[in-house]
Amino acid sequence: MKEASRHEAVNRIYLRREKSGAWLLMLWVQPNSARSALAGLHGDRLKVVLAAPPLDGKANKELVRFLSRALDVPRKNIEISAGLGARGKTVRIINPDPDALGARLP
């Protein structure tokens, strides 16, 4: 039963697993929202709305903070690996619990 839940996260279109065991999360980010939240899908990416402006890296910092809380992963284990200046971003999550990750993502 536990093995099946580990495969749930793999089947999400916006989530990929690296050989290293880290996960890549493909996101579409919308800054300047009233609050930070997961907001469904945007094409093949998970949409995240952020309560921060896209200035001076504030939205990127808020994205890491929000994902850390939402996914219960330490901030040091979350890095934006692509799209620092774009709305389409790839976030690398190092050593998450696959069951917890699957339970917290839509």
What do the PLM-derived regions correspond to, one by one?
Residues 1-64, 70-75, 79-84, 89-106:
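Contiguous, often N-terminal, cationic amphipathic patches that form binding interfaces
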